[in-house]
């Protein structure tokens, strides 16, 4: 009996340690008014993105849910309007796997929205699933698509300054190692998928770092945010069906709810006084140091140039000139199978070699304005 009680005690103690070190996220306690401001959140039809959009809507922002599925995106927009009491929540179609869709979204947004104060790159994938593309789908969705979208929306971000870009990354970036000779090569097999996912998250951190350098003095700041281990659709999406019933209870016990995962992205989007930390990586609502590979400025700049090529941006092409080369129907950016005519192929970009966690109790203390009723995140 004593051994049993000791075992139970050890298990409970272990769970408490896991809960307070991984599951429980520092809450975002303040509520700044965002009336008159516009935010775009990608992948906002579920999980962290939906919770992030909800908190922005509660603060009075006009929130654009940029999602691939029209049905799920419009349903999420309806839910968020009902829950937040804010009718300024809308859906716009965006498929980050298609550069044509990214360009079409940008055209539609720039033609209809006079402001962009917050851009949150939340959408992402952890596996290619059964899709077999002639490019690195994980890098395309998790980095290249967001890179192009940011580039195309920069004119609006600059005219709305001070404004912010938040790139949702992951602690997996610590395992990433970028090989610039194979950056966009197709991913085959689960081992390559794990490596490609970590690499895409490293690309997120380097992108935020270089973007901060590129935008210094413009009033646009950017941050990489780690939401923590979250019990979301991304976690279970690629788990075999027979295993999901077994993993769901475990995930509920040891992973954060999406609402908890939204706290650090919200902190990066809203916290006053962190502008001097533009380009840094945040976790648990505080800045966190990254490994050498994630603070390599030369690699960050090299990734920037490689990303321009992969996104179909020519030398010297600026954001304003990109707006002139959009698909003919900007209102329906939903075709993932119609590549932009200028998209380069992998062989063109990369010829063959022969041819040449400290757990902080820091909270998001955002000044409260009188326009909205206070609600904790």
From Swiss-Prot:
GO terms for molecular function: oxidoreductase activity. Residues 317-327 have a biased composition (Acidic residues). Residues 328-337 have a biased composition (Low complexity). Residues 352-363 have a biased composition (Polar residues). NAD(+) binds at residues 46, 48, 197, 201, 232. Substrate binds at residue 170. PANTHER family: DEHYDROGENASE_REDUCTASE SDR FAMILY MEMBER 13 (PTHR43157:SF44), PHOSPHATIDYLINOSITOL-GLYCAN BIOSYNTHESIS CLASS F PROTEIN-RELATED (PTHR43157). This is Dehydrogenase/reductase SDR family member 13.
């Amino acid at each position: 009996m004593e051994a049993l009680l000791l075992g139970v005690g050890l298990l409970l103690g272990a769970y408490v340690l896991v809960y307070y070190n991984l599951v429980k996220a520092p809450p975002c306690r303040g509520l700044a008014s965002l009336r008159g401001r516009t935010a775009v959140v990608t992948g906002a039809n579920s999980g962290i993105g939906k919770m992030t959009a909800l908190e922005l809507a509660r603060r009075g922002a006009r929130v654009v849910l940029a999602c691939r599925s029209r049905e799920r995106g419009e349903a999420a927009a309806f839910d968020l309007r009902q829950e937040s009491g804010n009718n300024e929540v809308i859906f716009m179609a965006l498929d980050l796997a298609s550069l044509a869709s990214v360009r079409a979204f940008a055209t539609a947004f720039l033609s209809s929205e006079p402001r962009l104060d917050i851009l949150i790159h939340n959408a992402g994938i952890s596996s290619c699933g059964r899709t077999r593309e002639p490019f690195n789908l994980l890098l395309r969705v998790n980095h290249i698509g967001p890179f192009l979208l940011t580039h195309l929306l920069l004119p609006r971000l600059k005219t709305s300054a001070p404004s912010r870009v938040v790139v949702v990354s992951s602690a997996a970036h610590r395992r990433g190692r970028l090989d610039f000779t194979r950056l966009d090569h197709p991913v085959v097999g689960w081992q390559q998928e794990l490596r490609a996912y970590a690499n895409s998250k490293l690309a997120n951190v380097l992108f935020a770092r270089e973007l901060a350098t590129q935008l210094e003095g413009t009033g646009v700041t950017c941050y990489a945010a780690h939401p923590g281990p979250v019990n979301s659709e991304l976690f279970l999406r690629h788990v075999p069906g027979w295993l999901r019933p077994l993993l769901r209870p475990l995930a509920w016990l040891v992973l954060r709810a999406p609402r908890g995962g939204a706290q650090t992205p919200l902190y990066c989007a809203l916290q006053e006084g962190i502008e001097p930390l533009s380009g840094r990586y945040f976790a648990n609502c505080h800045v966190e140091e990254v490994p050498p590979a994630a603070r390599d400025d030369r690699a960050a700049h090299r990734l920037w140039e490689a990303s321009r090529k992969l996104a179909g941006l020519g030398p010297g092409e600026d954001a304003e000139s990109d707006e002139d080369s959009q698909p003919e129907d900007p209102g329906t950016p939903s075709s993932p199978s119609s590549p932009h005519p200028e998209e380069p192929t992998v062989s063109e970009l990369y010829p063959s070699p022969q041819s040449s966690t400290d757990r902080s109790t820091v909270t998001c203390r955002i000044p409260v304005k009188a326009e909205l009723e206070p609600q904790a995140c």
